Amino acid sequence: MLRTIFLLSLLFALSNASVQDFCVANLKRAETPAGYPCIRPIHVKATDFVFSGLGTPGNTTNIINAAVTPAFAAQFPGLNGLGLSTARLDLAPKGVIPMHTHPGASEVLFVLTGSITAGFVSSANAVYVQTLKPGQVMVFPQGLLHFQINAGKSSASAVVTFNSANPGLQILDFALFANSLPTELVVGTTFLDATTVKKLKGVLGGTG
């Protein structure tokens, strides 16, 4: 009996792509917590398993001088159900991917061009920082605050891969200053003065 229960629990934990060979996303249907519904295998094409978008640099003309080009199931249907996602990072000079977390996934960063200083902070507040060159890889454990900064004078780029179809994203600065949390509460919980908080809210579009 216990063996049967164990086997059933494993089956329920499997994704569609584990039960089947693959589950190419049907983008005409709504996404669910388990991903997109599968299109029928007879309609699957080789191009469903190919994504070309990571070969084009993103637009870095913005406040962080950086761009993220995602390759999730919505852009790359062949990834659906595989528990993977990927993206391209482009960092102009002085570009930064601010402190952020991915609650649902660990991340691997592979530097393509330029020089990138990257790091993360552990739950014990230990800091791990490294300047990476092309061909080097760094891993960021699930849920930990981490960042990437262009460490050179020219543009830099990288590819990141996640062990989840939905890694989630929360940017620390946006969480604090790009919402309607009252200034006095931000002051009380961050030890910043009200002038600084209001300035940051103004820059990031927050209110309160």
From Swiss-Prot:
Residues 1-18 form the signal peptide. Its main location: secreted. Expressed during germination, and also in green shoots, etiolated seedlings and whole seedlings. InterPro entries: Cupin_1, Germin, Germin_Mn-BS, RmlC-like_jellyroll, RmlC_Cupin_sf. Mn(2+) binds at residues 100, 102, 107, 146. The keyword Transmembrane helix does not apply. One of its GO terms (molecular function) is manganese ion binding. Glycans are attached at residue 59. It is found in: Secreted, Extracellular space, Apoplast. Keywords: Apoplast, Disulfide bond, Glycoprotein, Manganese, Metal-binding, Secreted, Signal. Is the most highly expressed of the GLP genes. Belongs to the germin family. This is Germin-like protein subfamily 3 member 1. It comes from Arabidopsis thaliana. The gene is GLP1.
